[in-house]
Amino acid sequence: MKVMETDAARRSVIIRGPADAVNKAFNVQLNDYEYERGTYRSHDGPVQLPSNLADYVEAVVGLTNRQVHAQHFSTARRHGGRALGKESNAKGRGAAKDPANTRPLTPVQVAALYNFPAGDGAGQTIGLYEMETNEGPAGYDPADIAATMRALGNLPMPQIVDVPVDGVENSGQSDGETGLDITVAGAVAPKAKIALYFAGGETQNIIHCLQKMIHPSGNDPVPSIISISYGWGPDDTGTPSFSDAEFAQITGLFEDTATNKITVLVSSGDSGAQIASRTQAQTSYPASDVWVTACGGTTIGNVNGSSFDEYVWNDIGGAGPGATGGGVSARFQVPDYQESVTIPPRVHTGQHGRGVPDISGNASENSGYLQVIGGRPPEPVGGTSAVAPLYAGLMARINANLGRPAGFLNSTLYGLPAATFRDILGAPGPANNSFGRVQGYNAGTGWDACTGLGSVHGQALQAALGSAGPAVVAAAPAPKASAAAD
C-alpha cells in the first residue's frame, strides 16, 4: 500500500495498492458483482480498521465503484419539439393549469421580475458541479453555448474554466444540463468566472469533487458560490446510494462551506415528492442537507411589465411533465433555522425532519429558457436545474456589490420579513407536488414543501445581507445516522 496524497483541510488520505493488500489492510474480500447496468467492484464483510486508527477515520471510500444512481434535474432530456411561445394549460393530478400567457422567458427577464440588484458578478467565481450519470457523461459544446447566449438576447459568452476531477473532463457533447447551468448563471452574472467541475459517477468521485470545490489547492479556482443541479438519490436511511459513513463525509464537507463562506444552492428535483419510490414521498439528496439552500420550482406567466403571476410548478399531463421537488427529510432533523416555520409530518410515515425546499424560482419548461443542444434550433428547457444557477447568479451579484461573500444563507433567509419573498400559495394553479401515484405536500401561506419560502426579492436579500455584517455560521443538527467506516 502506498500513500499517494494527504490533505489536512480535506481531511483525506489517498492510498493505492493491489487487491490482496487492500483485502488485508481492511479485512475484506474484494469481488466483482453484476447488476442491471453491468459489473462493479465491492467487498464482502464490513471494513475493519486497526484500533489505533478506528477513532480517527470517518469513512473508507473507493472499495466500491458502483455508480451512484444520480439524476440531473433538467427537462432537456424530455424535449418533445413543442412549438415555441405556445400557451400552456397542462393538466393532471395536482396540476390545474399554468398562468395565462405562459411563454418562454430569459434569465435576464426573470432576474428583473425578481428584483435582482444591478450588477454583473465581477470578481466572483461560481462553481458548477457536473457529473456522469446513467444517461452519459457531462459536457458542453462551446458553439452551443454561444448560440444559446445569442438566443437569450445576444448576451456575451460566459467566462468558462473547466476543472477535471479524477481524470474526468468535458465530453465536448452538449448534455442539456451543463449548458443550462452555464447559460443561466452566465446570463445573470456575465462577469463572474464560471468554473465547471466534471466528476465521475462513483461515490469517491463525488467526494473528491466536493473537496476540490470547497478546499481548493494550487491552481484550483476558488468559488464563493456552488450550484448543484443533480440529485444523488433519496436521503432515506438504508437507500443504496451512500453508506452512513459516506453520508457523514459528504455532509461534513457541506458544513465546511459555512466555515469557508461559500453559498451552496441545490436543485430540489423535478418529479414532485417522488424520487425513487413509486408509492412513498421522499426528498432528494443533497437538496435535503441542512448546510445547503434547496431550490424548488415555480411557473411564471401573464407577464406585464413588472407584474406577473407565479404558480407552483406541477405540469403533470403537459408536454414537459414535471413538478417541484420537496418534502420532509428522513435523515436530517429539523435544523435550528427552520424552527420558525411549520413543517408538516412526512407523508406516509408521520416522521418529522428538515423541510425541503428553502426557496423557489422559475422552473417550468413552459416558462423556461431557450437552449441550443447539438446545433438544433433553440427549444425551451426548464427544471429546478434552472433555479440553482439563477440564484447562483444573484449571489454573485450580491457578493460583488457587498465586497464580501455571503456564505451560508439559510440562517438569514428564515429570519427575514415575509416581504422578502413572493409567497406561492397554490391557488389558483397547482396546489401540491403530488406526482404519479405518490401523494405529495400542499402549498399554502408561508413556508411549504412545494416552494419553500417562495421566490426571492433580490434587492431585499442584498439589503438584509448588507445590514447583517459578515456571515455568521449557524448551528444545525447532524444527520440522524451515525458515522461508521464502510
Regions found by a protein language model. Give the residues of each.
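Substrate-binding/charge-relay-adjacent region of secreted/lumenal peptidase catalytic domains
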Residues: 1-9, 14, 19-297, 324-325, ...
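Phosphate/diphosphate-binding glycine-rich loops and adjacent basic-rich segments that engage nucleotide
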Residues: 309-319
